[in-house]
Design a protein with these regions (language model features):
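A short hydrophobic beta-strand->loop->alpha-helix junction that borders the nucleotide-binding pocket
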Residues: 36-37, 92-97
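Conserved alpha-helical scaffold flanking the Walker A/P-loop in AAA+ ATPase domains
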Residues: 18-24, 102-123, 131, 135-143
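Flexible beta-alpha connector loops of hexameric P-loop NTPases
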Residues: 96-102, 129, 173-174
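Structural recognition of the conserved hydrophobic beta-strand(s) that form the central parallel beta-sheet
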Residues: 124-127, 140, 151-157
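Residues immediately within or flanking Cys/His clusters that coordinate Zn2+
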Residues: 32, 69-73
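Short cysteine clusters
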Residues: 73-79
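Charged, glycine-rich active-site and insertion segments that engage polyanionic ligands
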Residues: 1-52, 60-63, 81, 149-152, ...
Length: 357
């Protein structure tokens, strides 16, 4: 895989890119960064581009719109080694299964003490850093407390609140937000050679998640969205057996759960907006305004806001090892109460519920 040579080629994240460019241009790269923000919006790709630039012995320095720009050359042995995953001064740590384990952190520690082989720094990218188990996190903290001068550690996380506060406090935090759809659509036209309509639909369906937009098939994404939204119909929510099988199905994997929660969250956002948006220009699901309008008519604004708050809490605070189906079930039960117009304070959950192992 060929990683980007310049930040300009990565859509969005202007602030993050400016901070990182300045760090390299002034040779003030921090020892530890935390790249945080929602999943699939380009944090890891930016980290790879940053490391590639930092490692390249012939970076191109320029200016664009009055700001300094920096690019790796993309052709030297160092750049090619980054692309092929064989650079001796770049190590990537990812969860082994669902966790980052102490063994992986020990490997990092054994490597970080040695001087870089080619470049001037050694780069370590810890993807999904919040997946470190407690033993790994404590081990990692020791490295963060006294990192060797030549090392750069980049923690990438969509759930930074799951990291130890002592880890967070030692990293320079760089926040990433999904790029605006208006920016993503032209980028997709250029990057993927799509027509304007197709690019807009793909930008919409990927919800600003550049990682998905860059690779996703618009037709498949649409089918997936419609499958998730199908679970929100009144008939299906009212059928307890169906509701529980949907919860299992739409939360089969952690990624699937994330997609389902995002899709529901955006749907609810659209439900709030649609009455005030006659030409549907502000909707994210721009292709289905009537469906959004019809669903929204049956539900109170308060219930929608309460569900959004619940989803927000679950996304941020639910521990990684929580039963995924249970998370989605909680949301669907809340929505069921919303569409049948009942308060959630009663024992509805218990009546319809079943015992989960
Ligand atoms: Zn190079």
């Amino acid at each position: 895989m060929s990683f980007e040579t310049a930040f300009e080629r990565i859509v969005g994240h202007a602030h993050a890119k400016a901070v990182l460019t300045a760090a390299l241009a002034t040779d003030r790269v921090a020892h530890a960064y935390l790249f945080h923000g929602e999943a699939h919006i380009g944090k890891f790709l930016t980290a790879m581009a940053f490391a590639k630039m930092g490692l390249c012995p012939h970076p191109k320095i320029g200016r664009s719109s009055g700001r300094p720009t920096l690019a790796s050359c993309g052709q030297c042995p160092s750049c090619l080694a980054v692309d092929s995953g064989s650079h001796p001064d770049l190590q990537i740590v990812r969860p082994d299964g669902v966790q980052i384990k102490i063994r992986q952190i020990r490997d990092l520690q054994n490597s970080i003490v040695f001087k870089p082989m080619i470049g001037s720094r050694k780069w370590f990218l810890i993807d999904e850093a919040d997946a470190m188990n407690p033993e790994a996190a404590n081990g990692f903290l020791k490295t963060l407390e006294e990192p060797p001068d030549h090392s750069v550690l980049i923690l990438v996380s969509a759930r930074p609140q799951a990291l130890l506060p002592t880890i967070l406090s030692r990293c320079q935090a760089v926040r990433f937000s999904p790029p605006p759809l208006q920016a993503l659509s032209p980028w997709l036209q250029k990057q993927r050679g799509l027509g304007p309509e197709e690019a807009r639909l793909l930008a919409t369906l990927s919800m600003g998640r550049i990682g998905i937009a860059a690779e996703g098939d618009p037709a498949e994404l649409k089918i997936e969205r419609d499958r998730i939204l199908g679970a929100l119909s009144k008939e299906r929510l009212e059928d307890p057996a169906d509701l529980f099988s949907q919860s299992d199905d739409l939360a089969a994997t952690p990624e699937q759960l994330d997609r389902s929660l995002d899709t529901i969250e955006i749907w609810l956002r659209d439900v709030l907006i649609v009455p005030h948006d006659p030409d549907a220009s502000l909707l994210i699901n721009q292709d289905i305004p009537e469906q959004i309008m019809a669903w929204g008519r049956a539900v109170s604004t308060d219930a929608v806001l309460e569900t959004l708050t619940l989803i927000h809490l679950l996304k941020r605070a639910a521990p990684r090892n929580l039963n995924h189906a249970l998370v989605l079930e909680t949301v669907l039960l809340k929505l069921r109460d919303a569409v049948i117009g009942e308060s959630t304070t009663g024992s509805k959950t218990g009546e319809a519920g079943r015992v989960r192992k």
